Amino acid sequence: MNRFSKTQIYLHWITLLFVAITYAAMELRGWFPKGSSTYLLMRETHYNAGIFVWVLMFSRLIIKHRYSDPSIVPPPPAWQMKAASLMHIMLYITFLALPLLGIALMAYSGKSWSFLGFNVSPFVTPNSEIKALIKNIHETWANIGYFLIAAHAGAALFHHYIQKDNTLLRMMPRRK
């Protein structure tokens, strides 16, 4: 086996799409007046896409344990394999934790929010101090997420163009 399964490949790229939408919606939100319809659309898009990221990452975690990883040919040094393993752990933790922190942030704000058009009421007692702490963690960790994404993509490109192994090709969809 020299590639990940079709399911793993699909989930990888759809996760990237939803991560990009989540980040873009939050960044673009600031371009619009607070409370405007576009601002609110960007905010709701951020919430909804973030929850989809959690669902996708959780699904990927389950599926990852059903399949073995395809071999990298030629094999990289052991330290690179350890670094890759650590990077994947950090990516999974990040994109499983960020949506949960976002949900907690909304809950502690005391405001209702919408998920796919369904109203979600706060389920904890509002607390501005806890909200501020969670917001700080959420935003800091999201900024770290930018670095993790760049490092992950950079490593894949390094393996493809410099080391000339099949690291990147293992996760690419097949050409028809």
UniProtKB/Swiss-Prot annotation:
Gene Ontology biological process terms from the UniProt entry: respiratory electron transport chain
Chief location of this protein within or outside the cell: membrane
Membrane-related topology note: Multi-pass membrane protein
InterPro entries: Cyt_b561_bac/Ni-Hgenase, Cytochrome_b561_oxidase, Di-haem_cyt_TM
Note describing how the cofactor binds: Binds 2 heme b (iron-protoporphyrin IX) groups per molecule.
Pfam families given in the database record: Ni_hydr_CYTB
Protein's UniProt keywords contain Ubl conjugation: no
Binding site for heme b 2: 46, 138
GO molecular function per UniProt: electron transfer activity; heme binding; metal ion binding
Protein origin, superkingdom: Bacteria
Subcellular location, record wording: Cell inner membrane
Name listed for the protein in its UniProt record: Cytochrome b561 homolog 1
Species for this entry: Escherichia coli (strain K12)
